[in-house]
Amino acid sequence: MRLNTLSPAEGSKHASKRLGRGIGSGLGKTGGRGHKGQKSRSGGGVRRGFEGGQMPLYRRLPKFGFTSRKAMVTAEIRLSEIALIEGDVIDLNVLKAANVIGPQIEFAKVMLSGEINRAVTLRGLRVSKGARAAIEAAGGKIEE
């Protein structure tokens, strides 16, 4: 088998419609667009959500909520992810270096998900009650 002999399986690819190539093709003249009207024109058609002039659903429903800007720079970290990181002291920079969190993250909270079997020191991270208990049970400590 060579790259130049590869071809798709028989019947897996349909030939593209060749529009405007004579009456006999079935797609000549109007090219499957019918006669006149907005959808037959070049660039014709209505935008997404358009309901023929009726007040569209996205305008009938009220606005609600907002996107918290703090949520964009905050991350949740699982205890199982902490267990995989080398080193005894773990802070925000160590998490970024290990690609556990993105470079734009400014705050992180460690949650109880998974388990940890070695003593680690968390520095400058928020910690949930369950995660705090698990870290201290493993002999680790949390520094503010």
UniProtKB/Swiss-Prot annotation:
Gene3D superfamilies: 3.100.10.10. SUPFAM superfamilies: Ribosomal proteins L15p and L18e. This is Large ribosomal subunit protein uL15. PANTHER family: 50S RIBOSOMAL PROTEIN L15, LARGE RIBOSOMAL SUBUNIT PROTEIN UL15M. GO terms for cellular component: cytosolic large ribosomal subunit. One of its GO terms (biological process) is translation. One of its GO terms (molecular function) is structural constituent of ribosome. Part of the 50S ribosomal subunit. Keywords: Ribonucleoprotein, Ribosomal protein, RNA-binding, rRNA-binding. HAMAP family: Ribosomal_uL15. Residues 21-31 have a biased composition (Gly residues). Pfam families: Ribosomal_L27A. Belongs to the universal ribosomal protein uL15 family. Binds to the 23S rRNA. Residues 1-53 are annotated as: Disordered. PROSITE patterns: RIBOSOMAL_L15. It comes from the Bacteria.
